[in-house]
Swiss-Prot record:
Involved in the fragmentation of the mitochondrial network and its perinuclear clustering. Plays a minor role in the recruitment and association of the fission mediator dynamin-related protein 1 (DNM1L) to the mitochondrial surface and mitochondrial fission. May not be essential for the assembly of functional fission complexes and the subsequent membrane scission event. Also mediates peroxisomal fission. May act when the products of fission are directed toward mitochondrial homeostasis, mitophagy, or apoptosis. It comes from Rattus norvegicus (Rat). GO terms for molecular function: identical protein binding; lipid binding; molecular adaptor activity. It is a single-pass membrane protein. Residues 144-152 are mitochondrial intermembrane. InterPro entries: Fis1 (IPR016543), Fis1_cytosol (IPR033745), Fis1_TPR_C (IPR028061), Fis1_TPR_N (IPR028058), TPR-like_helical_dom_sf (IPR011990). It is found in: Mitochondrion outer membrane; Peroxisome membrane. Belongs to the FIS1 family. This is Mitochondrial fission 1 protein.
């Protein structure tokens, strides 16, 4: 599963699917499969703007898809949001998938990895906030010391 989350699309694949998508768009009608393939490539890009664009395309597809297609759309929406560190959104999608398919092992594993990432980022976030609080307290102490020395 971690391979799926960390896999990067090749520039060549991205350009090929982008060309196909734009060609169909120019002709006035983009097929669901073309839009999904392009979105799937974008979600695996190393650029956050591409990932966001892929998420938008997947969200557009969601109401149009069959049950099987929707499962894929929701899964890659979770993957895209995970890659953007939008863990709450990623969890929303993966838990929605697990409601309809409680035995989906891929979704269970993705949920576990999202929870793990949230805990890791949460601890890092708390450490940063704690460090900032110590820094502010230290600065206040130094200012207090300087003020008291200047009065002496």
């Amino acid at each position: 599963m971690e391979a799926v989350l960390n896999e990067l699309v090749s520039v060549e694949d991205l350009k090929n699917f982008e060309r196909k998508f734009q060609s169909e768009q120019a002709a006035g009608s983009v097929s669901k499969s073309t839009q999904f393939e392009y979105a799937w490539c974008l979600v695996r890009s190393k650029y956050n703007d591409d990932i966001r664009r892929g998420i938008v395309l997947l969200e557009e597809l969601l109401p149009k898809g069959s049950k099987e297609e929707q499962r894929d759309y929701v899964f890659y929406l979770a993957v895209g949001n995970y890659r953007l560190k939008e863990y709450e959104k990623a969890l929303k999608y993966v838990r929605g998938l697990l409601q309809t398919e409680p035995q989906n092992n891929q979704a269970k594993e993705l949920e576990r990895l999202i929870d793990k990432a949230m805990k890791k980022d949460g601890l890092v976030g708390m450490a940063i906030v704690g460090g900032m609080a110590l820094g502010v307290a230290g600065l206040a102490g130094l200012i207090g010391l300087a003020v008291s020395k200047s009065k002496s």
